[in-house]
């Protein structure tokens, strides 16, 4: 697959553009995976190319696994580049934290007319970093939000657990439940300690076009089913122009990728075993 790489220093955002072989005037900003050119990102490109869609993969930075004060201007610049390079219809898709980012960006930029949030939240929370620190793999960053705009952090729900208790709670719950990772208690306890305010809620009623929300009851990272139901209620209570579609599965965990995309992942994995 041919791509054009983008760097913060020269382009204002980190990502890669993958043009579809067919002549398409549609593009998706895909924030799937930890890096814009990693395994999951490339898989999402292959899947979207099969649908005849150009793809702009994006991530915070090369091998940057945290999310803190991510400037929405980066997505704004990516939209501008896509428009000047023949894309008339632009959508955005994200999963997990980037699902929340997709909703937030779409509520700011009306050029996004298809928004897909896979296991998103309906609010913005405190920024965090991943790596290694005092024996912890993840920790919250004081005074920082997940996202920022025009140099200011967006209002956010603070975590009630500070470093290192933040990670210890996740670690303890993961061990207790036997899950790969379990952070649901972290989010539930934080919302109990600090009920979500209107300023922290994503204004999904400002989203244009079509909004698709997908989650599962058995999500153990956070209660995305509750968050999606709150968004459904919000849309009923407020005037809006977008069309909302939502699906909540009973069993799908935190990773609710389409079956055909999962098949692409398996195919790619088998191919890599043969090639390498």
What is each stretch, according to the model?
Residues 39-40, 220-230, 257:
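Conserved alpha/beta-hydrolase "acid-adjacent" motif
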Residues 117-203:
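Accessory cap/linker subdomain of secreted extracellular hydrolases
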Residues 58-91:
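Catalytic nucleophile-loop/oxyanion-hole region of alpha/beta-hydrolase
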Residues 99-110, 115:
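Short glycine-enriched nucleophile-adjacent loop
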Residues 1-26, 265-268:
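N-terminal cap/lid segment of alpha/beta-hydrolase-fold proteins
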Residues 40-58:
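Short amphipathic alpha-helix adjacent to the substrate-entry channel of hydrolases
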Residues 191, 195, 214, 229, ...:
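C-terminal catalytic histidine-bearing segment of alpha/beta-hydrolase fold enzymes
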Residues 207, 213-215:
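Short beta-strand/loop motif that positions the catalytic acidic residue
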């Amino acid at each position: 697959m041919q791509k054009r790489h983008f760097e913060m220093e020269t382009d204002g955002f980190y990502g890669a553009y993958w043009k579809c072989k067919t002549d398409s005037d549609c593009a998706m900003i895909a924030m799937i995976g930890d890096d814009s050119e990693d395994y999951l990102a490339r898989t999402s490109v292959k899947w979207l190319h099969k649908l005849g869609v150009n793809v702009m993969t994006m991530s915070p930075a090369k091998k940057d696994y945290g999310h803190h004060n991510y400037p929405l201007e980066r997505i704004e610049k990516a939209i501008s580049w896509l428009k000047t390079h023949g894309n008339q219809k632009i959508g955005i898709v994200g999963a997990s934290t980037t699902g929340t980012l997709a909703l937030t960006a779409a509520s700011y930029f009306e050029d996004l007319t298809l928004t897909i949030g896979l296991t998103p939240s309906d609010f913005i929370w405190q920024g965090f970093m991943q790596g290694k620190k005092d024996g912890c793999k993840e920790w919250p960053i004081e005074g920082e939000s997940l996202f920022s705009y025009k140099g200011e952090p967006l209002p956010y729900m603070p975590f009630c657990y500070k470093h290192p208790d933040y990670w210890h709670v996740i670690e303890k719950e993961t061990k207790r439940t036997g899950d790969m990772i379990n952070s649901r208690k972290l989010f539930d306890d934080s919302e109990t300690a600090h009920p979500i305010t209107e300023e922290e809620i994503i204004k999904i009623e400002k989203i244009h076009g079509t909004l698709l929300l997908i989650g599962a009851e058995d999500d153990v990272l956070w209660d995305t089913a509750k968050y999606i139901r709150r968004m459904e209620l919000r849309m009923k209570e407020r005037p809006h122009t977008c069309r909302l579609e939502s699906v909540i599965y009973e069993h799908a965990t935190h990773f609710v990728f389409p079956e055909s995309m999962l098949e692409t992942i398996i195919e790619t994995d088998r191919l890599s075993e043969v090639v390498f």
